[in-house]
Amino acid sequence: MTNIRKSHPLMKIINNAFIDLPAPSNISSWWNFGSLLGICLILQILTGLFLAMHYTSDTTTAFSSVTHICRDVNYGWVIRYLHANGASMFFICLFIHVGRGLYYGSYMFLETWNIGVILLFTVMATAFMGYVLPWGQMSFWGATVITNLLSAIPYIGTNLVEWIWGGFSVDKATLTRFFAFHFILPFIIAALATVHLLFLHETGSNNPTGISSDMDKIPFHPYYTIKDILGALFMMLILLILVLFSPDLLGDPDNYTPANPLNTPPHIKPEWYFLFAYAILRSIPNKLGGVLALVASILILILMPMLHTSKQRSMMFRPLSQCLFWVLVADLITLTWIGGQPVEHPFIIIGQLASILYFLIILVLMPITSIIENNLLKW
């Protein structure tokens, strides 16, 4: 008799994706973050669902409903802070996951990589709209500033912004539609993640060496299931420490003040995970130029396969490229820091230099370094 997990139509799919999947024998802990992202998504959908049961998407009651969740709902504060800090964990895992892809040349799986970039955009859009929902000062002004950037688009800009707002300013209509989109997008993300996985399983996983591992595969279960569980426990530990000891560490104090269209906060800034892009946006003194740089800073990932000039796929045996990669990481940390600082000297010039360096490393220095490494190896 055939095993039910190999014969049943549904179980067969799960079996081929998570149990009998042939996986490289040498993938390191950097490969854990895909499963961690899946766990983050499930956590966000579940906590979000319970929050939506008590939240009201109306400008007059939104702020009060969030306060009500924290004060009156059983363990509402835990659910709320799990959701808020869960988003931060989501982005930490996302950035590491993308960084792993860049370091080990995983972008050579074109379909998987492109779906991944689309996923990144979708998650960023979802997080932005979620930040607007508590209707605090930073929610309101963040929404106003970021949506207003679309007005930089020639000819249709102003109409587009008013269409998104549903009026002449961020108001009740904006909040309601943002809530609707924030609710539906995670399910679209889940569908895209399934497609992401589908394309990955067409080629099989990459590994740290960047060399085909077809001759040396091991079953996903039990080896990588247990490894993923360990990673998940570590992530949950960090998340629970954040939630239970300093839930507001990554938030903005301004968001504890109800939204007031007549009072602008001194420093409008998004959540920490958008600060690098915000710094790039601010470093260009022209509105349209800034918006284009902002979009380009993420969209540049799509160009990675075309910018790959090395004869080796992975950076594992390429010390010069490794140095550049870590300079890029340091540059992104610098941009994140600058994005949270006021627009004044010396932060302006640091931000501009860091922004130039970001594009310079990816578009110029990395491809040239790869060619130099090829020549050093006489390839």
From Swiss-Prot:
Its cofactor is heme b. Keywords: Electron transport, Heme, Iron, Membrane, Metal-binding, Mitochondrion, Mitochondrion inner membrane, Respiratory chain, Transmembrane, Transmembrane helix, Transport, Ubiquinone. It is a multi-pass membrane protein. The chain crosses the membrane at residues 33-53, 77-98, 113-133, 178-198, 226-246, 288-308, 320-340, 347-367. GO terms for biological process: mitochondrial electron transport, ubiquinol to cytochrome c. One of its GO terms (cellular component) is mitochondrial inner membrane. It is found in: Mitochondrion inner membrane. Pfam families: Cytochrom_B_C (PF00032), Cytochrome_B (PF00033). Its main location: mitochondrion. A ubiquinone binds at residue 201. The cytochrome bc1 complex contains 11 subunits: 3 respiratory subunits (MT-CYB, CYC1 and UQCRFS1), 2 core proteins (UQCRC1 and UQCRC2) and 6 low-molecular weight proteins (UQCRH/QCR6, UQCRB/QCR7, UQCRQ/QCR8, UQCR10/QCR9, UQCR11/QCR10 and a cleavage product of UQCRFS1). This cytochrome bc1 complex then forms a dimer. Belongs to the cytochrome b family. Component of the ubiquinol-cytochrome c reductase complex (complex III or cytochrome b-c1 complex) that is part of the mitochondrial respiratory chain. The b-c1 complex mediates electron transfer from ubiquinol to cytochrome c. Contributes to the generation of a proton gradient across the mitochondrial membrane that is then used for ATP synthesis. This is Cytochrome b. It comes from Phacochoerus africanus (Warthog). The gene is MT-CYB.
